[in-house]
Amino acid sequence: MINPIAFKLGPLSLHWYAVCILVGLLLAVYLAAKEAPRKKMTSDDIIDFILIAFPLAIIGARIYYVAFEWSYYSQHLSDIFAIWNGGIAIYGGLITGTIVLFVYCYYKVLNPIHFLDIAAPSVMLAQAIGRWGNFFNQEAYGKAVSQLNYLPSFIRQQMFIDGSYRVPTFLYESMWNLIGFVIIMVWRRKPRSLLDGDILSFYLIWYGCGRLVIEGMRTDSLMLLGIRVSQYVSVLLIVIAIVFIFKRHRQKGISYYQE
């Protein structure tokens, strides 16, 4: 088993979970800042937004998780703040971040669809990296299986939990996001085939479909009325994206890059 603590400095500990999130964040900011000028925005617009949105998104992700696990946290109130042990919900962070984005764009007089188009591939890459935090914390895994011989030994060993090998759903989602990121980056090199909002819509559909399937493999899902909450949200995002694409293309929307 890999120690979930990356290193200690006196009384302070830095967990691998946090390292994965921070590495994903830094790469996401770099990519978004690089793309911003092509969408009539500046790198400062991106950085200023991240400084506001990131801490709020983490809080939102934690609130989302705690809300659906309230039966536990109501009896362990001090654990609500133990975020280093895991327990942040990606959808909670995405919802919070999107709300902050619309407010930010309103006050900065920016086009939120442009911003979301820029953010989509960066977020997808950050998610691909961030999922490895679940690996180090031994969470977000699936059912017990007899063997995992198709995986490298370090993953097999870390996925040996409670006396059994577990389906590495974190890995499936990480790879799914990475593939989606590559598709977007290749597709974005052909802007004539893109309309404003297409990258955002692709992200919602791609991530939503992957999460819908992979969530069904997990054994630690947040539940609502007997159905996994993330599957509810995934279906909703897919429907929203399809409707958005249909309307955008039917109305002959604005090209992805404007001259």
From Swiss-Prot:
Transmembrane segments: 12-32, 46-66, 83-103, 109-129, 167-187, 194-214, 226-246
Matches recorded under HAMAP family: Lgt
EC number from the UniProt entry: 2.5.1.145
Coiled coil (UniProt feature): none
Binding residues for a 1,2-diacyl-sn-glycero-3-phospho-(1'-sn-glycerol): R131
Role played: Catalyzes the transfer of the diacylglyceryl group from phosphatidylglycerol to the sulfhydryl group of the N-terminal cysteine of a prolipoprotein, the first step in the formation of mature lipoproteins.
Cellular localisation: Cell membrane
Membrane topology: Multi-pass membrane protein
GO molecular function terms noted in the UniProt entry: phosphatidylglycerol-prolipoprotein diacylglyceryl transferase activity
Organism in which the protein naturally occurs: Streptococcus equi subsp. zooepidemicus (strain MGCS10565)
Protein family (similarity comment): Belongs to the Lgt family.
Pathway(s) the chain acts in: Protein modification; lipoprotein biosynthesis (diacylglyceryl transfer)
One Gene Ontology CC term in the entry: plasma membrane
A Pfam family per the record: LGT
Cell membrane listed as a keyword: yes
Biological process according to GO: lipoprotein biosynthetic process
Name of the featured protein: Phosphatidylglycerol--prolipoprotein diacylglyceryl transferase
Keywords: Cell membrane, Membrane, Transferase, Transmembrane, Transmembrane helix
Superkingdom in the source lineage: Bacteria
